[in-house]
Amino acid sequence: MSSSINSVIETQETNDYAIGKHIIERLFKDKLSNIVKREAYSATDMLFTASTKTRESHYSIEIKSIYKDYYKEEGFILKVSKWLAAIQDSDARDSTEGVFALYIVPKYRRWYIYNLRQINLNTAHLQNKMIKVTQYADTQKVLTPIILLYTSEAVVSGAY
């Protein structure tokens, strides 16, 4: 039974990474052009370098981990998928170093990147920032995490 459970978990994690890869590619295909270098995606990291359409700086985006947390608010389970990314501009004068969180909001087709150093990730703080919703993500559909934080706190945001 244990191996069966592990197999299910492993399969789910593999699916999560595949979905993460797909979303990252879709999101940044619109915002970033000329993918200069891409390394193979693995279960531990996903790394590629791309240049923006509006400037020549190159960004290295490394997905450190993908994990899911569950928060309960007003009887609804909000499924939160976080893509932790270390983003660093190759131009030292403009560098932005640190750990960032990429929040995907399929319901509203929005994405946000937050600087984790500027946001308290404890449950209470996250719940205070959530916009109330009346629908929650189906646990079988990894593509439907529902979370919205104030866009004014986002480093970068956009639609897809």
Which residue ranges define each predicted feature?
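N-terminal targeting/trafficking signals and adjacent low-complexity tails
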Residues: N6, S65, K72-E74, S95-F100, ...
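Hydrophobic, Leu/Ile/Phe/Ala-enriched alpha-helical segments that form helix-helix packing faces
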Residues: I23-L32, A50, A86-R93
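Short acidic/glycine-enriched loop/turn segments that link adjacent beta-strands
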Residues: A40-T44, K107-R109
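Nucleic-acid nuclease catalytic cores
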Residues: Q88-I119
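Intrinsically disordered, low-complexity terminal regions enriched in charged/polar residues
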Residues: R110-Y160
